[in-house]
Every structure is written in structure tokens, then in C-alpha cells.
Design a protein with these regions (language model features):
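N-terminal active-site segment of His-dependent metallophosphoesterases
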Residues: 1-73
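A short acidic-Thr-Gly-centered motif at the start of a beta-strand
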Residues: 10-19, 45-47, 78-80, 151-154, ...
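Acidic, His/Gly-rich catalytic cores of divalent-metal-dependent hydrolytic chemistry
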Residues: 18, 179, 184-258
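Residue-level marker for buried hydrophobic side chains located in beta-strands
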Residues: 25, 54-56, 87-88, 159, ...
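Divalent metal-coordination and catalytic microenvironments
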Residues: 28, 59, 74, 90-91, ...
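Active-site environment of divalent metal-dependent phosphoester hydrolases
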Residues: 30-34, 62-65, 92-97, 167-168, ...
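Active-site neighborhood of divalent metal-dependent phosphoester bond hydrolases
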Residues: 50, 63-150, 182-188
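His/acidic metal-ligating clusters that form di-metal
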Residues: 136-207
Length: 258
């Protein structure tokens, strides 16, 4: 992997001459507040001079050391920059909400309290960051914020959703379970979705973004010790201009092009 400090002279792609807004789409965070703060600094430098939308793909909590700080940072960002910060809900926010209301049995799959609090779920780290023993003790403000998060975002060129979309449904007909949880048949689908689908949810072993003809995965494994990744887009071209992580900019040719 080739990493460089993000700067205009090291741009991986060129912003269209008539572009007016850049979008910085940020992958799964999983309680990694230090990495997130570094990445946001890189995004600010890379997008300097343009109106910028920050779009977070979900999974802010669990596994990492400070879910509470991540939630507070994102909530404060939305308040201080109204209309400029979009936060989507991830399946881990859905799990936290369900755990807080004793509704884990309503979720897809075999999610239960033991799984969520275990090593794969990472819920124990979330509770520890709040200094509490049970999800029902989470601050109402944080639970209300998680419940308010969008499930998807369509900017006309790209469709953003935490996990992806179901290929057998139009983008307008997607349902919550798929937007938050899907892997197959989404990941193996090769035909167009009508937009470039930008998603996370499935950690990439290579720890670099994976750009396909019809989708882009930006979950580079922050929940398992990897970096947090971001993709920079303008409002005139579908594909990303650059990829960043908390460690710096990734040259486009280094990213996976499956």
C-alpha cells in the first residue's frame, strides 16, 4: 500500500471544472475515535476550497475503544454543520437500539445479547465507553440520534447505504433489512444498479477500498485493527477522485479494482 500526505499536488483524480460540491464518504468507524479524527483532518485538507459534504456510511459503535466519543463527535458535527453532514445507520446502531429496548430477537439472523457482548459483536466495548452495564442505560440523546439516522442517501450519481442493496429490487424499493445487513446476492452481483452503490459492512481483508463497476466498498476493517477509509467524489463524475485513510492518501492504482 502506498500512502502519502493528502494534498492537491498528490491528487489521485481531478475535480471537474464545473464541480461545486465534494462529498467525502467515510467507511465503518467502530469506536475508533483517534483514527476518525485523523481521517477528518485529511478530508478537510483534501477538500479545501470546495463546499464539502461529509457522509458517514454507518457502524460508529462496537468493537473499538470509544464508541461514545464517536457518537458525540458525529452528533455535534451534524448540529454545527446543518445540511453538510449525513450519517447513515449501520447494523451495529440497529443492534444497540434493539439491545436497549430488549428487542434483539426482532433483528435478522441469530443476534442475541450473548453474541452482541461477545468478541465478534463488540457491544461490551460500547458499554464500557459509557461506563454502564446494560444498553438500557445508554443516554436517551444518543439512542434518539441513532434512531433518527437515514437508511440510505441518493445524490443522483451514487447511492449510499451501509451494507448495500438487493439486486432484485429497484433503489426506490429497498428495505431496511437489506440496507443494513445484506451481503449476498449483492456482493456477487455484476450488473448495474443504476447508480454506483457506495457501502461498507463487509470488511476488506486487503484493507484498501474495493472499487467495482457497479459498487464501492469502503469498509477497510477498522473494527479489526484496520484503518478507516474515505472516498472523495465531486458532483459531476460518478467515480471517486481519491481514497484516503487515517494514515494518508492511497494512490488510486493501489486500491482494489475487482
Amino acid at each position: 500500500m502506498t500512502l502519502n500526505p493528502p494534498s492537491p499536488s498528490n491528487a489521485s483524480g481531478s475535480v471537474a471544472e464545473d464541480a461545486s460540491v465534494l462529498t467525502c464518504a467515510i467507511g465503518d468507524v467502530h469506536g475508533q475515535i483517534g483514527k476518525l479524527e485523523l481521517l477528518l483532518d485529511h478530508c478537510e485538507r483534501r477538500c479545501a476550497g470546495y463546499a464539502t459534504r461529509l457522509l458517514f456510511i454507518g457502524d460508529y459503535v462496537d468493537r473499538g475503544p470509544d464508541s461514545r466519543a464517536v457518537v458525540e463527535l458525529l452528533r455535534d458535527l451534524q448540529r454545527s454543520r446543518p445540511g453538510e453532514v449525513v450519517c447513515l445507520r449501520g447494523n451495529h446502531e440497529a443492534v444497540v437500539l434493539a439491545a436497549a429496548s430488549d428487542q434483539l430477537h426482532t433483528l435478522p439472523g441469530d443476534v442475541d445479547m450473548e453474541l452482541w457482548l461477545g468478541p465478534s459483536g463488540g457491544g461490551l466495548q460500547t458499554l464500557a465507553s459509557y461506563g454502564i452495564a446494560h444498553a438500557s442505560q445508554l443516554p436517551a440523546e444518543d439512542l434518539e440520534w441513532m434512531a433518527s439516522l437515514l437508511l440510505s442517501y441518493d445524490d443522483g450519481l451514487r447511492y449510499f447505504a451501509h451494507a448495500g442493496v438487493h439486486p432484485e429490487r429497484s433503489l426506490a424499493e429497498q428495505v431496511e433489512d437489506d440496507l443494513l445487513w445484506i451481503r449476498e446476492p449483492f456482493l456477487s452481483h455484476e450488473s448495474t444498479f443504476g447508480r454506483l452503490v457506495v457501502h461498507g459492512h463487509t470488511p476488506l481483508k486487503a484493507r484498501v477500498p474495493d472499487l467495482r463497476a457497479n459498487r464501492l466498498n469502503i469498509d477497510t476493517g477498522a473494527g479489526y485493527g484496520g484503518p478507516i477509509a474515505a472516498a472523495i467524489f465531486d458532483d459531476r463524475q460518478r467515480n471517486p477522485l481519491a481514497f484516503l485513510t487515517n494514515a494518508g492518501e492511497i494512490r488510486m492504482e493501489t486500491a482494489s479494482h475487482g
